Amino acid sequence: AQNRLSWNNYIVWLPCRAPDGSFFRQKGLIPMSRDVSVGYLNLTTGGILKQAFKCLGDRYGWGGMLESRDCSSYIREVYRCFGWILPRNTTGQLQMPVRKIELAGRCCSEKEQILRALEPGTLLYFPGHVMMYLGYENDNFYVINDVSRLVKEGETMPVRVRSVIVNTLAVRRPNLRTWMEELTLALIPWET
């Protein structure tokens, strides 16, 4: 806030680190045109999707590299806006005591039938990756996720995406199996 009036700004306290490593806080200003919420947002499907789409195009960073997020921390941060503290990685998320639907061992048509009944915002997993289900249209099933690489439909070589994107479950992993084929679990954080 250095030498600025707070007109049309929210005044916030920012945690800072002094040169000697000690903690101090400093006032900061956030323009009123930006998203600010005092407390957690109300958990609604629309709210979850709105928060998820605010990150569209953000850079991927495995384990927080490049001051960025990977798939599990992206999902964690979206749900944190609603007061849900999810574990940092997919292994921990899979152990949460919430409603789970096993998809491993099912054929794609069975998985599609299950997905049609799920609400947007449901989390979908395959080994090493989590994504947020958006819904389906014209037999295409859509997700939003923070992804490093994938094989585009009709191609055989992986491309480095390294971004938050929307894609269908028809894209492939480097092993050339579709994401639909690879799905192992649906997790609904708001149901126990």
Task: Set out the residue ranges of the language-model regions.
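Aromatic- and glycine-rich peptidoglycan recognition patches
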Residues: 21-22, 34-38, 133-192
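Glycine-rich, flexible loop segments associated with nucleotide phosphate handling
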Residues: 24, 28, 111-119, 161
